[in-house]
Amino acid sequence: KAEIGMYYQQDVIQAVANQGTKIKSIGAIVQSPLSIVLSLKDKNITSPSDLVGKTVGYGGTALSESIVKTMMEYVGADASDVNLIDVGFDLMSSMTTGNVDATIGCLVNHEVPQLEEEGFDVNYFMANGYGIPNYYEEVFLANNEMIESEPEVLKGFLRASAKGFEDFKKDPDGCLAILMNNQNEENFPLTQSVEEKSCETLLPLMETEDAPFLTQTEECWQENIDWMLESGLIDQKVEVSDVMVDLGE
């Protein structure tokens, strides 16, 4: 139904390993995580050690549970030291109303500027500094059949995406104007100042000195496969070649 999709790196690994889905990543959109552990500033939570005895809201996923477990063990604590509560999609409101002390799963480029816009002071930290391997927040993917039969079409898409990213770097305000002019205002209204901050946060994470936009490495995929297998998130080990492909220039 679609030639190209956007998905999360760990979800790609799970889909291939646990369900046998015939897909592969063809390029990384963001070179590092955007998902964070977020809290209001007065909670004084700046690392996993500060989560001991605290209540943390999450979206009910096994991935978030494994991340918390790994982080807590990394700092010498235990997952049972944290009270995890499934709050569904109410990550922000559960925190601002005081129902939880922190949340895991909010995005640094969305919920942080949104909360700051609403007048809240916040603290946050990334999980990948605490036993979690670095990962790509989102990737472009295609099904294996198309990768085999129409690689030139996919290469053309990646070239166009890279051109769009270059335009974004050169004229972020102009690109933001396109976003604002095409927003779904009725169902998902956007705030100009929030989206400006979001772009400022996102832009430097989409490429690094060593990794241009769309770069993905076998090492990053292998580290995530190994961690997910160790954490019980996947039923069997998969090869890097099962989940990613380098289409070349």
What are these regions (language model features)?
Residues 224-249:
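Hinge/cleft segment of the Venus flytrap/periplasmic-binding protein
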Residues 1-88, 92-97, 101-109, 125, ...:
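Short, glycine-/small- and polar/acidic-enriched structural segments
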Residues 10, 90-93, 98-187:
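Pocket-lining segment of extracytoplasmic ligand-binding domains
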Residues 24, 176-178, 236-238:
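Short, hydrophobic secondary-structure boundary micro-motifs
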